[in-house]
Structure formats: C-alpha cells, structure tokens
Amino acid sequence: ILFPYVEDEKEALSAVESTRYPPKGIRGVMSAARMNKYGTVTDYYKKADDEICVIVQCESKKAIQNISKIAAVEGVDGIFIGPSDLSASIGKIGQFEDEEVQSLISLGLENCKKSNIPAGILTAKRDFAKKYVADGFTYVAINSDTNLIARSAENLLKEFK
C-alpha cells in the first residue's frame, strides 16, 4: 500500500497502524469480506499483517530530512520519493532538473541506503531513469499510465490527421 505525503515518523506510524489488525494496529475487521474469501480463510488475520507491504511517499524537504526516522518505523517496507511534490515543496514546481531538487533526491536516496530500506522514484525521462538506476534506487517507475496512454493517443491521432 502506497501512502502519499508522509513527512515524519508519527505519520509513518499512523500509516503502518492503519494496515495492521488489532492489537498491532487499527485496521477494521470484517469477517466476511473478499480479502479472506468471505470468511473461509481461518488464519487470515494472523497472516495478513505479515503480508502487507507499506511504502511511504517522501514528497517534501521535511520528509527527505526525516527519512532515517521514517525508515526506522517498524512496518515501513520502503520509501518512494515523489519529485513533483518535492519540487513544489521548495517553490520550484515542475522543475525536476533543478540542482536543489536533484540534490534533495540524492540526499533522500543516501538516507535510504544508510537506513537499509528500499528506495523508489518516478520519472518521465529516460535519461533520469537510467541515472536513478545507476545511483542505486531499488525501483524506478518510468512515466505514468495516463501519460503513456495520452502520448500514444496523440501519436495515433497525428497519423490520421
């Protein structure tokens, strides 16, 4: 489960707790729901806590500076750095190539490595994707589904105009 805009360890703990059943968390219990085959999986609640993957998005300068504390929260399985909101948080909206934005991304990755936690990032640019892989990001999302669909539709439309 991906949690957006987590800035500190308190918010990270809240995210984790919302995915865990009592007594480890506050997730609501529904005995006859699809996730446990409508009540037929007898040990579902015992297994569920261990099978959830919690990834928090660090999308501000404050979050980048707090990554070590966020990563230390038990149950946080990964960090995803969000360049769009990160650039906006420092008054440079949409300026992903800006030196300060890239410096914060590098700091975030460095803090993830020091904390031994997987780090991910999103970019629409191939050269940045290659750079992020080379830098050591665990996973790199290249572009978005909506952008890919829109560009494909534009190219198809050009073909028939």
Report each predicted region and the residues it spans.
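Alpha-helix-loop-beta-strand connector modules within alpha/beta enzyme cores
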Residues: 17-25, 47-49, 97-120, 160
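Glycine-rich phosphate-binding active-site loops on the catalytic face of alpha/beta enzymes
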Residues: 2-15, 79-90, 137-156
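Histidine/lysine/aspartate-rich catalytic loop segments that bind and position anionic ligands
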Residues: 61, 74-92, 97
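Glycine-enriched alpha-helix->loop->beta-strand junction motifs that scaffold or abut catalytic
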Residues: 19-21, 73-78, 134-140
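Conserved anion-binding
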Residues: 3-74, 88
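Non-membrane alpha-helical structural segments and their capping/turn regions in soluble enzymes
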Residues: 9, 98-106, 126, 150
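Hydrophobic faces of well-ordered beta-strands that scaffold small-molecule active sites
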Residues: 1-3, 54-59, 71, 79-81, ...
